[in-house]
């Protein structure tokens, strides 16, 4: 999965928008003004930070060494996924969906997309 495909997939989520609030190297994808994904645009291999259920994140770290505690984030509620080819794209998309859904669920109804 490359940067362009990943960015396109993230922005296809209802209400998703992109921003660079930290620096020009870190793309932040938000829904309802809240972050659900962060990408280092020059990372090699590509890395993505995603919101996660704390228990599920721990379970994913065992079979997938590429799933790590969230870099520069709350390590309990965020994970960093190194996109080095060791995790199937379907699993990565599932992690993205979970991150998006967790953030949307936490939004006030007035800020939830459609």
For each feature predicted by the language model, list its residue ranges.
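Charge-dense, helix-prone N-terminal extensions
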Residues: 1-114
């Amino acid at each position: 999965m490359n940067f362009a495909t990943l960015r396109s997939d993230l922005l296809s989520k209802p209400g998703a928008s992109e921003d660079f609030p930290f620096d020009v190297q870190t793309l932040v994808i938000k829904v309802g003004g809240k972050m659900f994904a962060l990408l280092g645009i020059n990372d090699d291999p590509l890395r993505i930070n995603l919101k996660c259920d704390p228990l599920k994140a721990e379970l994913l770290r065992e079979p997938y060494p590429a799933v790590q505690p969230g870099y520069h984030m709350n390590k309990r509620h965020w994970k960093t996924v190194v996109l080095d080819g060791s995790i199937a794209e379907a699993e990565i998309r599932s992690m993205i969906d979970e991150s998006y859904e967790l953030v949307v669920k936490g939004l006030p109804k007035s800020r939830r997309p459609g």
